[in-house]
Design a protein with these regions (language model features):
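Hydrophobic anchor at the start of a short beta-strand
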Residues: 1, 21-27, 77, 96-97, ...
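NAD(P)+-binding Rossmann beta1-loop-alpha1 motif at the extreme N-terminus of oxidoreductases
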Residues: 1-44
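Internal alpha-helical scaffold of NAD(P)-dependent oxidoreductase catalytic cores
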Residues: 19-20, 92-98, 109-196, 223-229, ...
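Rossmann-like NAD(P)(H) cofactor-binding subdomain of soluble oxidoreductases
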Residues: 44, 52-109
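Structural motif
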Residues: 44-48, 120
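Glycine-rich phosphate/pyrophosphate-binding beta-alpha loops
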Residues: 105-106, 157-161, 191-193, 203-217
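C-terminal active-site/capping subdomain that shapes the small-molecule cofactor and substrate pocket
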Residues: 216-244
Length: 244
């Protein structure tokens, strides 16, 4: 099995599955000198390469290049894609590609991967990859189409980004009138709200940031034309500008 891209997502997946497979090869110039072309005998690959947002559009050029190389080396290879890609771009990829959205945090990626409760597999290869990861305990495997899998990823991240922006904007506007920590501890008791994404970040700054929320929110606005999310982006920018 090839791990193509060994950032925090690829590494978490690769290290977790490595003890359960015959051979694990890392393909990433920052971590090894291995090349895809030298592993035509590989039957499967996990792809976790960057998909930055450029001018509001998800740049999937690295994915397209990697998938092209993998299929050139072995036309029958099974590919598990973990990089975030909008549905319209995802559907242009070959049927070999099964989409498996990740919900890992950069600081706790290995722990998050080991403790995930839902494992989404979008595409024709879902049954194959469920067998590959069948050693995982306490996980619900959900097989669906690639578009639905991609929508789950984007709606998950943009919903949480919106939650951050909402709570932080209210704090900025009227935070002097209430006890914020007490407020969120009370609201966290409501199951339909939950405890996450209400507090300030570790440095006390306002607005969402990090590896995923900014790029995913912009890309999803480009894909959907959502006016609500466009407003969230504008509000978040103001929050960040006012706390730098």
């Amino acid at each position: 099995l090839l791990s193509v891209g060994y950032g925090f997502v690829g590494k978490a997946a690769g290290e977790y599955i490595a003890p359960h497979i015959k051979q694990h090869v890392i393909i990433d110039p920052a971590h090894s000198t291995e090349r895809i072309a030298d592993h035509a005998d590989a039957g499967a690959a996990i792809v976790a390469v960057p998909t930055p947002t450029v001018n509001g559009v998800c740049d999937d050029s690295v994915i397209v290049d990697v998938v092209t190389q993998l299929i050139a080396a072995n036309p029958d290879i099974k590919i598990l894609l973990k990089s975030t890609v909008p549905p319209d771009q995802l559907e242009k990829l070959p049927a070999n590609v099964t989409y498996n959205p990740e919900f890992l945090r950069a600081k706790t990626a290995a722990e998050d991967f080991a403790n995930q409760r839902v494992f989404i597999l979008g595409g024709a290869g879902g049954a194959y990859w469920q067998r590959v990861f069948s050693f995982m305990q306490g996980v619900e495997f959900i097989r669906t189409d690639r578009t639905t899998a991609s929508m789950v990823k984007y709606m998950h991240n943009t919903w949480l980004a919106m939650k951050v922006a909402y709570f932080h904007e209210i704090y900025k506007l009227v935070g002097d009138s209430y006890q914020h920590d007490e407020l969120i501890s009370i609201l966290a008791k409501f199951p339909n709200i939950g405890p996450s994404h209400m507090a300030m970040n570790d440095e006390g700054k306002l607005g969402y940031g990090g590896h995923c929320f900014p790029k995913d929110t912009e890309a999803f606005v480009e894909y959907t034309g959502s006016e609500i999310l466009q407003k969230v982006i504008e509000i978040n920018k103001k929050l960040i500008d006012n706390t730098q």
